[in-house]
Each structure stands twice: as C-alpha cells, then as structure tokens.
Curated annotation (Swiss-Prot):
It is found in: Cell inner membrane. InterPro entries: Fumarate_red_C, SQR/QFR_C/D. Its main location: membrane. The chain crosses the membrane at residues 36-56, 70-90, 110-130. Keywords: Cell inner membrane, Cell membrane, Membrane, Transmembrane, Transmembrane helix. This is Fumarate reductase subunit C. One of its GO terms (molecular function) is succinate dehydrogenase activity. It is a multi-pass membrane protein. Anchors the catalytic components of the fumarate reductase complex to the cell membrane, binds quinones. Belongs to the FrdC family. CDD domains: QFR_TypeD_subunitC. The keyword Transmembrane applies.
Amino acid sequence: MTATTSKRKKYVREMKPTWWKKLDFYKLYIAREATAIPTLWFCLVLLYGVISLGSLDSFGNFISFLKNPIVIILNIITLGAMLLNTVTYYVMTPKVLNIIVKNERINPNIITMALWAVTAFISLVILVFMYV
C-alpha cells in the first residue's frame, strides 16, 4: 500500500492566548468557567467541616479557621462567583429550554422568574428550618 502525500500546505488557524479578550461574551464565558476554582475552595472547606465533626476539639479548630479574615474574604469571593454562575445559568436556561404550550413558545422571562422564585423559596425554607 502506498501513501500519497499532499503538497498543499495545511491551513492552521492561529489561536492567540488572548482570544477571549476580544468580546465581552468571551470574557463572561471565561469568568463563568473560572467559578470552578471558588467552587473547589468551598468543597474543601465543607469537607474539612464534615471531617471536623468527629470531635469537639477539631470542630473548635474548624470554627476558628472560619473566623480567619483570609478565609472570610475567600468565602465572600466564592459567594460572588456562585451568584455570577447562578445569574448566567438562569439567563441561559430559557434560551436552550424550548417549552411549547398551545403551539407557542413560553416567554423566556416566565422561566427565568420561575427559577428565581424556586431559589428564593428554597432559601427561605432553609433559613426557617435553620433557626427553628
């Protein structure tokens, strides 16, 4: 079997490292994808908290760890990242969710408001049960 080689030069599109800085859409995309880093931080803190529930001494250390100003700042950054992730998810969902009722597509604002209503309701229920 013989292999034929082409004398044509392959087209390779140049991809610069700053491709995402051209459009605001790309910047938001990168910011949304970067929320994985604060999510990892939150998961590690949560894991540390669950492990420290084993004894009172380690749980006391966990509480003092949470009171550290650096940890508080990192948790505030994590909260902001999760809010960004939630907002972009709720804006994107009606665009990809195609619900048709009586041969008409549902208004995207209704879906977005329903998502926020469910979020508010669940948050309220958690807050009520936390203090009861």
